[in-house]
Amino acid sequence: MSEAIEFSAWAHERARHFEWLAETMLPKPGQEPKRLVGAMRYAVLGGGKRIRPLLCYAAGEISRAPAERLDRAALALEFIHSYSLVHDDMPAMDNDTLRRGRPTTHVRYGEAEAMLAGDALQAEAFAVLAGIDDPAAGMRLVGTLARGAGVFGMCGGQSLDLAMVGEKPGEAELARMQSM
């Protein structure tokens, strides 16, 4: 079997497992507050390549990390990614109306509910990591995710992106933004 086929099978298996995990760990459909839960599920379960969870599983399997920690780390990464997409699609940012071939969360649920869904997904990402069976490992992961998503990470990069709207950034600006 070629390495490409082996990787493809591995990625497909992990992605299927991740879909089941996300479906299981998100609040259940119809659970109160129904619109918020619906918007959260819509944002996370709407498809996508699941690159972040796959990278998490790959790195974790290489380092022989426990499966439960890998699941929680992969879920936290995807929750952060989904929250960032929900916020990025909003009219105040990129004003996108389609994501993954369907209406964005704010188009489907309204701006206020989409904002709350993004906020709730961010909070859930940290709650998932805080629930890791080894509290010290969980806290290290919480800190790593907070730094990666915060002012000197993803949010900082988005701020730089917004500051350059209408401008043609140079290589230095692009490198700085991409490093965050």
Regions found by a protein language model. Name each.
Residues M1-E3:
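N-terminal, positively charged, Ser/Thr/Ala/Gly-biased leader segments
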Residues E6, E13-L26, G30-M180:
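Mg2+-dependent prenyl diphosphate-binding active-site environment of isoprenoid biosynthetic enzymes
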